[in-house]
Amino acid sequence: MKRFLDCTASDFENMKKKELLEAISASEGRVLVCETIGILQPMLGDVTNAEFVASMGADMILLNMFDVNHPVIQGLPKTEDREVIRKIKQLTGRPVGINLEPLEQGKESSVETNEMWKLSGGRVATLENAKTAVEMGVDFIVLTGN
């Protein structure tokens, strides 16, 4: 297996979970993950922040605030909802993951926040959302607490 750092975009297209983990491991801690928030205005106008961080050296891209039911990535060309992740992967050539947030039953959010940052149903760590994310093409899921 190649080290992650020696892989090309076409290598990532065909990688399965085990191969991706082995490639990361073989890179001995030299893989950089960068988190972006797709609902925010892009730093470069019509270029997504995911593309921007990839151009700056991010090896893997983590999308925060990504709602699997209502995906929004500012700066992305018109794309069907279920194809948003695949489009980001195509544009960046990088593995792409999302954050999902565990939530206690009966709670709407893990923190008090304003409406913009309020936890939506498509961002909660549920089996259904994880399955939807995988169907959309995510390479990894991070369980997080914002």
Model feature map: region roles:
Residues 1-4, 8-21, 42-43, 63, ...:
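Glycan-processing catalytic domains of CAZymes
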Residues 1-37, 81-93, 97-99:
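N-terminal amphipathic alpha-helix/helix-capping segment at the start of soluble metabolic enzymes
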Residues 12-16, 42-45, 80, 121-125:
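Short secondary-structure boundary/capping elements
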Residues 22-23, 43, 50-51, 85-87, ...:
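Short, flexible, glycine/charge-rich loop motifs used to bind or transfer phosphoryl groups or to couple energy/partner
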Residues 29, 35-54:
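Active-site-flanking structural segment that lines cofactor/substrate pockets
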Residues 35-41, 66-68, 99-105, 146:
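Active-site beta-loop-alpha junctions enriched in small/polar residues
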Residues 45-69, 74-76, 109-146:
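Alpha/beta enzyme core
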Residues 66, 80-102, 108-124:
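A generic, well-ordered mixed alpha/beta core segment in the N-terminal half of proteins
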